[in-house]
Curated annotation (Swiss-Prot):
Places the protein is found: Cytoplasm
EC number: 6.1.1.15
Any one GO CC term of the record: aminoacyl-tRNA synthetase multienzyme complex
UniProt free text on domains: Consists of three domains: the N-terminal catalytic domain, the anticodon-binding domain and the C-terminal extension.
Subunit details: Homodimer.
Keyword terms: Aminoacyl-tRNA synthetase, ATP-binding, Cytoplasm, Ligase, Nucleotide-binding, Protein biosynthesis
PROSITE patterns the UniProt entry points to: AA_TRNA_LIGASE_II (PS50862)
Full protein name: Proline--tRNA ligase
Length: 478
C-alpha cells in the first residue's frame, strides 16, 4: 500500500520543474512510455483512447464535408521527393532514409514519409482529367517520421500519429475557402472537445509550411507560458500541381492546374491537454474527450448491498456516459487519488448511508466540488455536471491565457516581458523578415501568427520603429 501511495503522490510540482511535471503525468497517468528507439514512444491504452476520441470527432466532421479516407505508402522514392524544391529543402534535415532491402543496397533511396504531399500528387496526376473530377477530398490516418533532435512524448517525437488531408480544387477561391473551413473545424475541436482556447491566424512567410502560399494556424498557450501550434491548414496554390503535372480541362476546354490544400492535427494535442489543464495532482481530462467520463467508487463495499447498488448504477449510467466501476480491494482514499491523478472528470461515491437516503455524491475533478444528487435523476445530473465541467475548464483556460497575454510596443518592453512574464506577446510588426529574425535571435520568441482579429496596439514595429503593418502574436514555443 505504501508503494501505491507513493505512485499517486510522487508528481513533481509544476512550479518546481515543469518539464519533469509533464513527464511524471505522461508516465503515471499511463498515457505513454518510452521505447528503446530514441524519440519514439509507446502510446498506452489511456493515451490511445484519447486519440481515438479525437479521431472520431475529426473523422465524422470530414465525412460530413465530403472527404474520403485513403491509405498511401509509407515510403517515398527520392526522385519523387525532389520534385518540389521548397518542400524538399524544408524537410531534408528531418528525413529518415531506407538504403537497403535485406542485404541488398537499393538502386534508389526511399524516404520514410515525413508528410505525403508527393504521394498524393503523383496519384492525383493519374486520376484527374476534367473539372468534373474535382474537387478531390482525401484524408489519411497514419504515422509519419521526422528525425527530431530534441524530443518529448506527444509534443515532439520522431514518429507520431496524425491525420493529413490533401485536397485539390478547380479554383483558388474554392481551395482557400476549404483551407479556412478545416481550420475552423480544428478550432471547434479544441474548444468544444478539448476545452482549449486557441488563437486563429495566418503564419508569416518565414514560419509557413515548406512549399505553401499561405499557412493558417491555431495557437494555444500552455501553463508555463509557452505557445503550442495545435493544428495547421495550408493553401499550396498551384505549386505542387505544376511540379507534378496535375492538369485538368477547365469549363472552357483549356488545360489548367488545380489548387491544392493540405492540413493536419496530431497526437501533440494530447500533450496540449496535459499542459493546458493539468495541475499538481495530475491530469485533468475535458469530459467530452475523456475515455472514462465518470468513475464509481463504492464506499464500505464489504457491507451488504453496496456493490450491488454500485453495479446497478453503472448499468444505468453506461447508457448515457462512459463510466467505470472500481470494485477492487484498494482503499477508497487511494482510489480517489488514483483517478484524480488520471484525470477522470467526475467521481461518483456511494456507500451505505447514501443508499439509505437514495443518493450519491458527485465530486468534480476540475475543482473538487461535491454535490449530492438523488439516484432517481442521476443520469440527467451526471450529464449536466459533465457539461458544467467542460464549460468551467474552457473558461479557466481562457482566463489563464488572457492573464498571460501581454502587449509590447518596443524591444525593451518585449525583452522584459518574455524574460519575466512568459506568455503570448501582442506586438506590431512592419512585415520585414529581418525584424522577425532579430526578435528570435535576441529573445528566443517566434511569430506564432498574425491573428484574423487584428487590432492596433501601436503605430510602429516593435523591433525597428518603422510603420507597422500587422499585429502579431509572439512567444517561445514547443
Amino acid at each position: 500500500m505504501a508503494k501505491d501511495k507513493k505512485f499517486v503522490e510522487d508528481i513533481t510540482p509544476m512550479d518546481e520543474d515543469f518539464a519533469q511535471w509533464y513527464t511524471d503525468i505522461v508516465k503515471k497517468a499511463e498515457l505513454a512510455d518510452y521505447s528503446s528507439i530514441r524519440g519514439c514512444m509507446i502510446i498506452r491504452p489511456n493515451g490511445y483512447a484519447i486519440w481515438e476520441n479525437i479521431q472520431k470527432y475529426v473523422d465524422t466532421k470530414l465525412k460530413e464535408y465530403g472527404h474520403e479516407n485513403v491509405s498511401m505508402p509509407i515510403f517515398i522514392p527520392e526522385n519523387l521527393l525532389q520534385k518540389e524544391k521548397d518542400h524538399v529543402e524544408g524537410f531534408a534535415p528531418e528525413v529518415a532514409w531506407v538504403t537497403h532491402g535485406g542485404d541488398d543496397e537499393l538502386a534508389e533511396r526511399l524516404c520514410v514519409r515525413p508528410t505525403s504531399e508527393t504521394l498524393f500528387c503523383e496519384h492525383y496526376a493519374k486520376i484527374v482529367q476534367s473539372y468534373k473530377d474535382l474537387p478531390k477530398l482525401y484524408n489519411q490516418w497514419c504515422s509519419v517520421v521526422r528525425w527530431e533532435k530534441t524530443t518529448r512524448p506527444f509534443l515532439r517525437t520522431t514518429e507520431f500519429l496524425w491525420q493529413e488531408g490533401h485536397t485539390i480544387h478547380e479554383t483558388k477561391e474554392e481551395a482557400e475557402s476549404h483551407s479556412l473551413k478545416i481550420l475552423n473545424m480544428y478550432s471547434r475541436l479544441c474548444e468544444d472537445m478539448l476545452a482549449m482556447p486557441v488563437v486563429m491566424g495566418k503564419k508569416t512567410d518565414k514560419e509557413k509550411f515548406a512549399g505553401a502560399d499561405d499557412t493558417y494556424t491555431i495557437e494555444s498557450l500552455m501553463h508555463d507560458g509557452k505557445a503550442l501550434q495545435a493544428g495547421t491548414s495550408h493553401y499550396l496554390g498551384q505549386n505542387f500541381s505544376k511540379a507534378f503535372a496535375i492538369q485538368f480541362s477547365d469549363r472552357n476546354g483549356k488545360l489548367d492546374y488545380p489548387h491544392y490544400t493540405t492540413w493536419a492535427v496530431t497526437t501533440r494535442l494530447i500533450g496540449a491537454i496535459i499542459m493546458v489543464h493539468g495541475d499538481n495532482s495530475g491530469l485533468k481530462l475535458p469530459p467530452r474527450i475523456a475515455p472514462t467520463q465518470a468513475v464509481i467508487i463504492p464506499v464500505a463495499q464489504h457491507k451488504e448491498g453496496v456493490l450491488e447498488k454500485a453495479e446497478e448504477l453503472k448499468e444505468r449510467l453506461a447508457k448515457v456516459v462512459r463510466v467505470k466501476l472500481d470494485d477492487s480491494d484498494k482503499m477508497p482514499g487511494w482510489k480517489y487519488s488514483e483517478y484524480e491523478m488520471k484525470g477522470i472528470p467526475l467521481r461518483i461515491e456511494i456507500g451505505p448511508k447514501d443508499i439509505e437516503k437514495n443518493q450519491a455524491v458527485l465530486v468534480r475533478r476540475d475543482n473538487r466540488e461535491k454535490t449530492i444528487v438523488s439516484l432517481d435523476e442521476i443520469e440527467i445530473k451526471v450529464q449536466e455536471m459533465l457539461d458544467i465541467i467542460h464549460n468551467s475548464m474552457l473558461e479557466e483556460a481562457k482566463k489563464t491565457r488572457d492573464e498571460k497575454t501581454y502587449v509590447a510596443t518596443n524591444m525593451e518592453e518585449f525583452e522584459d516581458t518574455i524574460e519575466n512574464k512568459p506568455g503570448f506577446i501582442k506586438a506590431m510588426w512592419c512585415g520585414d523578415r529581418a525584424c522577425e529574425d532579430k526578435i528570435r535571435e535576441v529573445t528566443g520568441a517566434t511569430s506564432r501568427c498574425m491573428p484574423f482579429e487584428q487590432e492596433v496596439v501601436s503605430d510602429t514595429c516593435v523591433c525597428c520603429g518603422k510603420k507597422a503593418k500587422n499585429l502579431v502574436y509572439w512567444g517561445r514555443a514547443y
